[in-house]
Amino acid sequence: MLIINGKIIPIAHTICAFSAFFAALVTGYSLHFHKIVTNAHYTYPDEWFPSVSATIGDRYPERSIFQILIALTAFPRFLLLLGHYYLNQSKVCFLVGVLRTVSCGGWVYITSTDDHDIHDIFMITYIVLTLPWDIMITRYSSPLTSKNKGLTATIFFGTLFPMIYWYIQHSVQQRAGAYSIYAYFEWSLILLDIAFDAFAYADFKKIDIVLAFNEKPGNTSFFQIRDSSPINYGEEKSSELQKSGEKKVEKEKPVARSATGSYFRFDSFFYLLTNIFNGFLFWSNVTSLLCSIWHFPLWYMGISGYEAAILGYLGPIFLYLPFVSEAFTQYGVLLGGIIAIGAYIVQMPELRLISVAVGTSITVATFVQNLRYITNAETSFSFALTWLLGLVASVILKMGFYTNNPTWVILDERNGGYNKTALVLTVLFGMLSPYVNSINFEGKRNAQAKSASLIGKLFLAVGFGSLLFGIHQLLTDSSTTIYWAWEGYNESHGPLPWPWGALTCTVMLFASLSSVKFMGKPLVPCLLLLISTAVLSARSITQWPKYIFGGLLYAIAMLWLVPSYFSALGQVQNIWVYVLSFSVYIIFVLAHVWVVAYAFVPMGWVLREKIETVLAFSSTFIIIGALTCKNLNIQLVTMGKKFFIYVFFFAVALLSLTARFVYDIRPTGIPQPYHPDSQLITAGIWTIHFGLDNDMWASEDRMINLIKDMELDVVGLLETDTQRITMGNRDLTSKLAHDLNMYADFGPGPNKHTWGCVLLSKFPIVNSTHHLLPSPVGELAPAIHATLQTYNDTLVDVFVFHSGQEEDEEDRRLQSNYMAKLMGNTTRPAILLSYLVVDPGEGNYNTYVSETSGMHDIDPSDDDRWCEYILYRGLRRTGYARVARGTITDTELQVGKFQVLSEQALVEHSDSMYEYGHMSEPEYEDMKFPDKFLGEGERGHFYHVFDEPRYYL
């Protein structure tokens, strides 16, 4: 019989693994230094340190030395897995370890030189699996080693952020030396990973490997691990933490009650107020993160790498780490709020995004930490109601701030943010929260509640993740469901955000208050959800019916289901259930993006233009989860009179705030054109990149200033569909139309799968129709055809149009034919404000400017155009200017001045209106563009290309 102490396993693993990487590095440095530090962009001396991939996989003999030594690591590696399994008895942990080991073999033996994509897939898989592996191993470790492992794991994942940053600097910015700095962090991950497994030494000393013959003749065993009994440090530690937590609560309860009596009960004023704010903070941070992420793929025109910040929603996974759950219980609201809201101080967009991701991660984890311990029925409903009222408060506040949340990091004091006020409130309620919410951790699991099966937990997790997505997609702004129903102006057009956004807020408030009636009774809400989803998915149902029976009914059904979910989740305390919920939420968010961004993402065709499918799946999962909740819910709740008195007070406060905001954002008067004496229409076209400027700040105020300065009567805005999760569910027309005192038509809605277009007009919009142009391959091209009532009741047609991508030639050909026919079908004077992606005088240009369309170019001699074009017909062209964008967006503002003529004047001018001949000064002073943008201009705006405006006879 041979007995070997288990400590030899981590020792052998550490020696073999470290030797493999170290030997390859030394050999590579000695033989091929210049070759292994060379990358796609730079070589020595700009780069001076090799990446792991270049070191282990590019050259002989270091590649062979590495692979031999790493092969020797396999035996102690699998012994390490078996030893951990014996100690913690966790099959899930063992399975993750095996998959992690296989993925390690993938990126080790398939190098980046062999197949770059496969190598990266295995590498990413390995890093992703390292998270649950480190957490579970740390959780199940003895107290002696858990701190060391926890610290090592924390440093490991903290190192990922600067590593990703420097990789982007290398691959996207092509910055010299960036790859060497990236390599430092990459090698640090290797050392930290080896060190983490080395800390198993203390745990493995407690076991022996026994090699012996079996007592039965003829039978032998390869080996067995012998010990008196399995040691489950995780259970011991969990028990200790739970006991210490119970003691802590017991200590705090008398202190709180002696100081404030019953103020800290579930029906107390302070409990309700604090958790309404916490609910508001939750939704503010959750919506802020995705709104910030969107800036990066937008400006990189593709996947940038910063999208990984979406993993911040998986904050609950950190509750597995020792002492983290207790820390978040005490300081989660405070830390999460300060970091996420305070991120506005950070000027660099990349670092601001990381700050928001960290803060949101803590906020989400703190929410989960509270929710998973609430087992009392009354406390559960009180917590659910305050969470809903926090949601309603955020929606009302967004309505009052023109659909921007004033706590978001895309705002500061310069563009309407109230970040400092939010920080003060966060500190106040963050300090109150651990005391007020101590009641959430009281009580035991109700004896009447049924234990959930694994399948039940899965359904509950998937349902809750879908519920979060559904609320975020349609119910985080008062105008989202309105725009799902909007089809343009006509005699019986649908609701507009003002004043009907207030109805959305009121219905959401009603649904929140009445949700107590449906706690544990999901059948009616599920039926309403089924009906409303069908209405929202039906493209034939539009305007008021879609808003009422789709949008409002959906809001009622969703909010009625929340208390049932909260009650059931309180009976299921497993952290993985919540991690799975937010994973499902992330998957649905990506699907929500894929339906529009299919041309820019892998496998985009799968979900192309299928928002209804995404909605249907989410509603189906919500219903299945809700029916599962029914089996887990405890007895009916009975809330006292005092509770409803306080709730009534908060409801009245929210209704009053709604009324105040409706009054504040009312139209300021009847819009009037700037130059009625000359009967001028000053029209512009501008691509505004979804209202986010180059530095990730909301740009509405700066856009308003330029539009005012240029005295635009009509403006077409492109890339405006911000009524999506990733754009913050914002309505750019809300503030623009209000502050500019203009009518607004929000083009094809968020359920039409376009990037959006908007028409703002000083003239009444008599009629407007929305068009989706042929796009068999690329992105959908949106268009608005609006008829404006101008001077002397002369009707003028305005077309706002965004064509497809440069790569999709057939799409653009079909779209040009469609637009030419659409413009040619009307004989009224017309203006096209467009984004055509064509050279002047070439290709599809000759379809837009043709006998079929009847349209003419505002200046055929301007040959420095590709994207934006202004065409016209039946109007007298008097001026044309191109204005630099500043840092608002990536595209200039083009402006044309046109004079509306009487029928007699039209006959007199006839074809002379289209003759070319420009001047440096206008015919009349009233027709002049502002001088402030001559020369260097103001605020980064100046006349460019011609360096001054052009005027025409």
Curated annotation (Swiss-Prot):
Stretches the record annotates as Required for function in lipid remodeling: 862-882
Keyword annotations of the record: Cell membrane, Endoplasmic reticulum, Glycoprotein, GPI-anchor biosynthesis, Membrane, Transmembrane, Transmembrane helix
Single GO biological process annotation from the record: fungal-type cell wall organization
Main location class: membrane
Subcellular localization, as worded in the UniProt entry: Cell membrane; Endoplasmic reticulum membrane
Record-annotated membrane-spanning stretches: 65-85, 92-112, 118-138, 150-170, 176-196, 279-299, 308-328, 331-351, 353-368, 381-401, 421-441, 451-471, 496-516, 518-538, 548-568, 586-606, 614-634, 643-663
Glycan attachment positions: N419, N490, N767, N792, N825
PGAP2IP-like: annotated segments: 230-953
Active-site residues per Swiss-Prot or TrEMBL entry: H802
GO cellular component, one term: plasma membrane
Function: Involved in the maintenance of cell wall integrity. Required for the replacement of the diacylglycerol moiety by ceramides during GPI-anchor maturation.
Protein name stated in the entry: Protein CWH43
Organism: Saccharomyces cerevisiae (strain ATCC 204508 / S288c) (Baker's yeast)
Gene: CWH43
